[in-house]
């Protein structure tokens, strides 16, 4: 019987992967990858900064558009409220996600 052929079945492969994951999870050096966690945190902080800037720009554009429509096009208030609320939801999404994750 060829033992290498038996590794193609799902059960031995699953057991081998589970053993490797348990081994890597118990060793903190492998889990933290010697400083890699700090690099990932700084990268994600940069992404959060960009998302905050984009959210401020989105809310600003929505409010400017709503003001233009109300003042110069004499639009209905309900049409403008939808755009302002959508802009606020898009703009607040980064802060809502930060609140939920921390």
UniProtKB/Swiss-Prot annotation:
Chain segments annotated as transmembrane: 45-65, 77-97
Recorded topology in the membrane: Multi-pass membrane protein
Signal peptide annotation: 1-31
Keyword NADP: no
GO cellular component terms attached to this protein's record: plasma membrane
Electron transport found in the keyword field: no
Intracellular or extracellular location(s): Cell membrane
UniProt keyword terms in alphabetical order: Cell membrane, Membrane, Signal, Transmembrane, Transmembrane helix
Lineage: superkingdom: Bacteria
Cross-referenced InterPro entries: TrbC/VirB2
Family in the record: Belongs to the PtlA family.
Protein name: Type IV secretion system protein PtlA homolog
Organism of provenance: Bordetella bronchiseptica (strain ATCC BAA-588 / NCTC 13252 / RB50) (Alcaligenes bronchisepticus)
Encoding gene (name): ptlA
């Amino acid at each position: 019987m060829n033992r290498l052929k038996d590794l193609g079945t799902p059960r031995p492969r699953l057991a081998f992967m589970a053993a490797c994951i348990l081994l890597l999870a118990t060793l903190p050096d492998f889990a933290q990858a010697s400083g890699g966690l700090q690099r990932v945190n700084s990268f994600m902080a940069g992404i959060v900064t960009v998302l905050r800037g984009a959210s401020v720009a989105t809310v600003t554009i929505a409010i400017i558009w709503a003001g233009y429509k109300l003042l110069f096009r004499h639009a209905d208030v309900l049409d403008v409220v939808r755009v302002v609320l959508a802009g606020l939801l898009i703009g607040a999404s980064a802060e809502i996600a930060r609140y939920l994750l921390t």
